[in-house]
Curated annotation (Swiss-Prot):
<comment type="similarity">
    <text>Belongs to the DNA glycosylase MPG family.</text>
</comment>
<dbReference type="Pfam" id="PF02245">
    <property type="entry name" value="Pur_DNA_glyco"/>
</dbReference>
<dbReference type="GO" id="GO:0003905">
    <property type="term" value="F:alkylbase DNA N-glycosylase activity"/>
</dbReference>
<dbReference type="InterPro" id="IPR003180">
    <property type="entry name" value="MPG"/>
</dbReference>
<dbReference type="GO" id="GO:0003677">
    <property type="term" value="F:DNA binding"/>
</dbReference>
<keyword id="KW-0378">Hydrolase</keyword>
<dbReference type="InterPro" id="IPR011034">
    <property type="entry name" value="Formyl_transferase-like_C_sf"/>
</dbReference>
<keyword id="KW-0234">DNA repair</keyword>
<dbReference type="GO" id="GO:0006284">
    <property type="term" value="P:base-excision repair"/>
</dbReference>
<dbReference type="InterPro" id="IPR036995">
    <property type="entry name" value="MPG_sf"/>
</dbReference>
<protein>
    <recommendedName>
        <fullName>Putative 3-methyladenine DNA glycosylase</fullName>
        <ecNumber>3.2.2.-</ecNumber>
    </recommendedName>
</protein>
<keyword id="KW-0227">DNA damage</keyword>
Amino acid sequence: MRLTRDFYAKDARALAKELLGKVLVREVDGIKLKGKIVETEAYIGAIDKASHAYGGRRTKRTEPLYGKPGIAYVYFIYGKYFCFNIISKTEGEAEGVLIRALEPLENINLISKLRFNKEFEELNNYQRKNITSGPSKLCMAFNINRDNNWEDLCESSSLYVEDVFYNDFEIIETVRVGIDYAEEARDFLWRYYIKDNAFVSVK
């Protein structure tokens, strides 16, 4: 069963933890790709200098951040990569969760072809470990791009999160990645991951 709007309508920090162990589903050419969410980061616009919406900043690019909980915010970085976020809390609050890493579960050959243009069996150990172990890596592997920006995960048939109950794990809380510019916010312990999971991007 997919997650509902009520599930997403909470503080980004709480949602980031509760998404761990849930399963992201992405349909590509009629085939459902599935991956367990193993690493997330929370962003809270009002108080977070790492957020694209810090201090109420509102632009065409960041407008999805102000949308309903459960909306996808997909943004472009470094001129070639995408990052996928899910909006939380309430409309207008500019809170969201970055999905940082997935553990591939179903249709791994297609995931591998999208990521490396190779069958999974052809990948070396480094490639297998890095197939979805980072926000842009998982976007490539699950074909998530600007077309998914604003997509409603509560209604979409091609991008949503399943309420699968994987809960036999310990959650590590630590600093976020790549936000040294964010002054005191760089020290917020708002990154969460499943302890000892091989697909976590940074431990």
